Amino acid sequence: LFETREAQPPTVGSANFVPPTSPDLVIANLEHAVTEKNTENYIRCLVDTLNSTQRFQFIPTAGAAGRYASTFSSWSLQSERSYFSALKAFSGTAPSSLQLDGSFSIITGDSAIYEGRYDIVFRHGLGGVDENAHGSVQFILHMDRSSIWSITRWIDIPATDRTSWSEWKGRFAN
């Protein structure tokens, strides 16, 4: 009458998302979320405003801020979800990757600053939009009431004559 069935794979989360009990785990989780194109894990790297007094803030490059002024004037966690979901949808099954090369300059009991270079690849197939973005980033991270670390402030710094992450956010959020 009853039979054992095959286990279904999880629809969200991943074995590569580790509870971020230290700032460095947030960075590793972000790299994995991009590589796996996992929207939920990507958002989990950003501050959970239900468990923290901190609010998320994204500071785009000056060029992207000018080009997508109306988009970035009201940027939010929902904007992060929208752009990432759209970018993921355009890329289909093509591989993606994120490499962060940096270090923490300051770590206190409940906050940290990470600075480094990024190289992100999404094979989205849209003409006129680079599939590689390069630049530097500064993340301000905080620990919430549950002792979980996340990014509260994200500053994108452009590389000369290269497409920035901000350009992708502005383009794919619309």
Label every PLM stretch briefly.
Residues 1-15, 111-174:
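Short beta-strand edge/turn micro-motifs at domain boundaries
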Residues 1-36, 44:
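Short, low-complexity N-terminal intrinsically disordered segments enriched in polar/charged residues
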Residues 5-13, 58-68:
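A solvent-exposed, charged loop/short amphipathic helix patch at secondary-structure junctions
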Residues 20, 82-85, 89-109, 150-174:
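N-terminal targeting or signal-anchor segments and their processing/structural boundaries
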Residues 26, 38, 42, 76, ...:
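Stable alpha-helical elements in mature extracytoplasmic
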Residues 37-62:
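Short, well-ordered alpha-helical segments enriched in acidic and aromatic residues
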Residues 65-130:
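Surface-exposed, charged secondary-structure patches
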